[in-house]
């Protein structure tokens, strides 16, 4: 199967979501990302594209900073939580928000979109499982086999599915220009970085923070502050609409940036996914706890022009299936 048909196939797999969010459903989008992690914005744009394609009506869009916890909701609304890689104890703010939603709305169907699950502390995993076990209509979408196995083992009373990342809904993504540079090294610099694997690629590398300008970062910080103040005033301002438009600009900026390069080497999962959506040759470097490798082995292994660096002894960038 060539790269194009591989991407089409992954997009088609997302139709499995319709089993739990049927066409024409009315939903609450509970925790859209209002921050500068551009990978999460690609997830959000894919999610919104999925809703639009299937006639799913979003009644309200909130985020963890302005969700009116405790507000009475129409019992027919499905509460939908953002997918990504922040399910676990590495990101307690977002994990805590999801748990609060599950506890506050025991009679609503709740769907967590495709997530990677990772807990450093098993006690934290057990505590989350205890909270989730009390909800009879909670559906957890996992985005790779390791997370699926964890969910099956610990969230035994919940409904579990395995689906690709929501960003695949965006295919095809059209490059904005012909490449003028050879290889982009797009390397993460935060606590998920795997230094042993990516040190060879860190020279002259970029990350989402360098794609965003100082002006972009100031605008995001301003909107985050405005979002909090807006909640205190009863949410009169259309923050979700303002952010939709501004995040469109950020996502297009990222597409333009990646379009300038022939190939990509990255330790960002969405650097890998965006490169694949653009049908660029790309190498993904595993992160600190195996998220990237797990995703690659679940969905991307065998996709032409994609490679994995998972072990320090295999930095020769050979295809993972060779």
UniProtKB/Swiss-Prot annotation:
It is an enzyme of class 2 (transferase). The keyword Transferase applies. Keywords: Exopolysaccharide synthesis, Transferase. The keyword Manganese does not apply. It holds the Pfam family PS_pyruv_trans. InterPro entries: Polysacch_pyruvyl_Trfase. One of its GO terms (molecular function) is transferase activity. Its EC number is 2.-.-.-. Belongs to the polysaccharide pyruvyl transferase family. May be involved in the production of the exopolysaccharide (EPS) component of the extracellular matrix during biofilm formation. EPS is responsible for the adhesion of chains of cells into bundles. This is Putative pyruvyl transferase EpsO. The gene is epsO.
């Amino acid at each position: 199967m060539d790269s194009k048909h591989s991407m089409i196939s992954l997009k088609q797999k997302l139709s499995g979501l319709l089993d739990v969010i049927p066409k024409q459903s009315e939903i609450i989008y509970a925790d859209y990302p209002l921050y500068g992690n551009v990978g999460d914005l690609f997830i959000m744009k894919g999610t919104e594209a999925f809703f639009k394609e299937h006639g799913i009506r979003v009644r309200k869009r909130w985020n963890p900073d302005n969700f009116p916890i405790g507000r009475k909701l129409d019992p027919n609304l499905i509460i939908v939580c953002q997918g990504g890689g922040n399910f676990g104890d590495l990101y307690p703010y977002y994990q805590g928000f999801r748990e609060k939603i599950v506890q506050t709305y025991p009679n609503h169907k709740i769907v967590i979109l495709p997530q990677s699950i990772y807990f450093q502390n098993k006690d934290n995993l057990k505590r989350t499982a205890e909270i989730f076990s009390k909800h009879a209509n909670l559906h957890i979408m996992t985005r790779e086999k390791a997370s699926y196995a964890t969910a099956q083992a610990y969230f035994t009373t919940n409904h579990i599915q395995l689906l690709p990342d929501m960003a695949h809904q965006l295919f095809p993504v059209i490059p904005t220009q012909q490449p003028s540079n050879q290889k982009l090294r797009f390397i993460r610099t935060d606590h998920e970085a795997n230094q042993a694997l990516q040190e060879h690629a860190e020279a002259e590398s970029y990350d989402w923070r360098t794609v965003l300008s100082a002006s972009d970062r100031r605008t995001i910080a301003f909107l985050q502050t405005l979002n909090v103040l807006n909640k205190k005033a009863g949410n009169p301002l259309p923050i979700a609409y303002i952010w939709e438009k501004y995040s469109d600009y950020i996502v297009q900026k990222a597409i333009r940036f990646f379009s300038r390069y022939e190939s990509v080497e990255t330790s960002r999962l969405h650097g890998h996914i965006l490169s694949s959506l653009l049908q660029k040759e790309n190498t993904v470097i595993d992160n600190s706890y195996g998220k990237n490798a797990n995703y690659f082995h679940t969905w991307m292994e065998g996709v032409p022009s994609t490679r994995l660096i998972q072990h320090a002894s295999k930095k020769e960038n050979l295809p993972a299936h060779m």
